[in-house]
Amino acid sequence: MDVKQNYEQAKKQYEKWGVNVEDALEKLKQIPISIHCWQGDDVTGFEVNQQELSGGIDVTGNYPGKATTPEELRDDLDKALSLIPGMHRVNLHAIYAETNGEAVERDEIEPKHFENWVKWAKENGLGLDFNPTLFSHPKADDGLTLAHPNKEIRDFWIRHTIASRKIAAYMGKELGTSALTNIWTPDGYKDIPSDRLTPRKRLEDSLNQIFEEEIDKEYNVDAVESKLFGIGSEAYVVGSHEFYMGYALKNNKLCLLDTGHYHPTEMVSNKISSMLLYSDELALHVSRPVRWDSDHVVILDDELREIGLEIVRNDALDKVRIGLDFFDASINRIAAWTIGTRNMIKSLLYALLTPNEHLKQLQEEGNFTDRLAIMEELKTYPFGAIWDYYCESMNVPVGESWLTEVKEYEKEVLSKR
């Protein structure tokens, strides 16, 4: 049987549960994933005076073909996007500014330094999201930025983040889709602090200054991102989950949950419903932590499936901004983007094909036997046949055939860098 015939057979199995497969695929087409540019160059960026990666994060591996120019990075993103079904977004960090060889300090970056990104996004029908880069810089060498006791250093990072919001607003206005400005700062201490409160007061004050200027949400939406620990901030991180959850709710900002920024057994999927009870919107960075925030490529594991289910079953497709955040330099970087993004979309399709209302009803009735049995049986339903049909209908490679294109691109382009 061909892809269409397999699809028709699979469709019947889902329809017996009352699942409208065609509606599910139409909904899937409308869900943008914000794809992080930094997988393509190992979080290096294009600053004239480049610094070693810092901020308690790490990239391991040395696979050949890494992008070293904006043009190479956009070409690589073009290739990955051609293998991923749907219309999506690209997430940029401030270090991806294009300054034509001029050394521009981070507190002096402007929209003009991202004109090429906006032009490219327009040509490709993409949205853009943005992040101030509060790491890999001499003024972040001691692990403190927005919570730094030195006002001069603190003010530098405040100016940088204010500039970043303006850049994001420019992107949102130009592209007709609001950009998400996500603030993550590595501030913390390696060993047990003698004062946990004062740095948090400073961070709160810095954020208040950053958000002083109101920006139309049609162009820019602000998010804040917590973290449990990083390399060099094992004992204490200023921007903890509780800090940012409180700040976001009090100040009407989005809380961004990164799946690698919690205890290894703490699941972000378990937080989504609670957050949505008290916040109109929520943002995610979907990653894969292996024993720590290792940022492995996202796979279709239980947690990813649960994240998709929580978004879909709670009617939150228009309330959750889904972004990815992983970087693996040990494998082909275009393959990493493709694997991770396709898996994120697969998790959403799996959720859309689940008879969620029926399963909810079983739970309300206390019928936990049927609930468990059906949830487990659905795992071996012909979901793959629906996925293949979706890929074919969206004119992207079916199954693992995309690997052939990646290998050809590696041979013709990446190997010559």
Curated annotation (Swiss-Prot):
Q: What does this protein do?
A: Catalyzes the interconversion of L-rhamnose and L-rhamnulose.
Subcellular location, record wording: Cytoplasm
The protein's required cofactor(s) are namely: Mn(2+)
Entry's Gene Ontology molecular function annotations: L-rhamnose isomerase activity; manganese ion binding
Top-level taxon of the source organism:
Bacteria
Q: Which organism is it from?
A: Oceanobacillus iheyensis (strain DSM 14371 / CIP 107618 / JCM 11309 / KCTC 3954 / HTE831)
Q: Which GO terms describe its biological process?
A: L-lyxose metabolic process; rhamnose catabolic process
What HAMAP family does UniProt report for this protein, alphabetically? RhaA
What's the protein here called? Answer: L-rhamnose isomerase
Instruction: Please tell me where this protein is predominantly located.
Output: cytoplasm
Q: Which family does it belong to?
A: Belongs to the rhamnose isomerase family.
Q: In which pathway does it act?
A: Carbohydrate degradation; L-rhamnose degradation; glycerone phosphate from L-rhamnose: step 1/3
> Where is Mn(2+) annotated to bind?
H261, D293, D295
Q: Which UniProt keywords apply?
A: Cytoplasm, Isomerase, Manganese, Metal-binding, Rhamnose metabolism
Q: Name one GO cellular component term.
A: cytoplasm
Q: Name one Pfam family in it.
A: RhaA
Q: Which reaction does it catalyse?
A: L-rhamnopyranose = L-rhamnulose
Note on cofactor:
Binds 1 Mn(2+) ion per subunit.
Gene coding for it: rhaA
